[in-house]
């Protein structure tokens, strides 16, 4: 069985019941995090122009939050808050690129101490305290690819079968600078709507389609992971 929880970040939970009716196997947990993707630039949040079919499907089968907010709209402070459960002003790292204290506890560290295999793949950008919580860290771009997602499917495939796992999959998509990828051309400059707060010109439209193409790449790898989880 695979169950889903969805918000600006995405968590997939898969679990199974053992033959003992009184015992439930601990759930496997997978977290997906995009980089610099606005909440309303996904189909499930009403954007009719971006192609995000895998995320949209998960959202339709799970829970979607429509009243959730950031306290700091910045990369590393948000990551540290998500993985620690603390507000940015309580992590010691409310500013971009600042590191929390080494003694801070993270979710994967707690899970690891309770028998979970823990793995990170893609963009890290959190601090040494968070490394302590992972059995494996794969933050090399040569391994993960330009979008940070290419190792994800293999990580699931290689996950141990004799213990539950927690996987933290963080992409570089759709952070600037945008470059060509296998999904370049998915979106057309003449077939999108420019938000009212932006100047509707050729440069803006080109920026938007390049941005949308990287969202589609992120979405594609989420679909690959979901299929691999079903096989596993």
Where are these regions (language model features)?
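Formylglycine-dependent sulfatase
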Residues: 6, 15-232
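Sec-dependent signal peptide recognition
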Residues: 1-8
């Amino acid at each position: 069985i695979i169950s889903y929880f969805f918000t600006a970040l995405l968590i997939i939970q898969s679990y199974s019941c053992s033959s003992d009716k009184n015992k439930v196997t601990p759930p496997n947990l997978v977290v997906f995090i995009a980089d610099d993707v606005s909440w309303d630039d996904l189909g499930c949040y009403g954007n009719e122009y971006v192609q995000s079919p895998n995320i949209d499907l998960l959202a339709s089968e799970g829970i979607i939050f429509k009243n959730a907010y950031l306290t700091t709209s910045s990369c590393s402070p948000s990551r540290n808050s998500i993985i620690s459960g603390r507000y940015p002003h309580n992590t010691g790292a409310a500013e971009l690129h600042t590191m929390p204290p080494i003694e801070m506890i993270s979710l994967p560290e707690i899970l690891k101490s309770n028998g979970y295999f823990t793995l990170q793949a893609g963009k890290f950008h959190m601090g040494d305290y968070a490394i302590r919580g992972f059995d494996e860290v794969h933050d090399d771009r040569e391994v993960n690819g330009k979008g940070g997602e290419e190792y994800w499917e293999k990580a699931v495939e290689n996950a141990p079968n004799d213990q539950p796992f927690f996987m933290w999959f963080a992409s570089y998509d759709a952070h600037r600078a945008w470059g060509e990828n296998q999904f370049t051309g998915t979106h057309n400059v003449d077939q999108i709507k420019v938000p009212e707060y932006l100047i509707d010109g050729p440069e803006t439209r080109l920026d938007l389609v390049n941005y949308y193409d990287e969202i589609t790449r992120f979405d594609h790898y989420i679909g690959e992971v979901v299929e691999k989880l079903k096989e596993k």
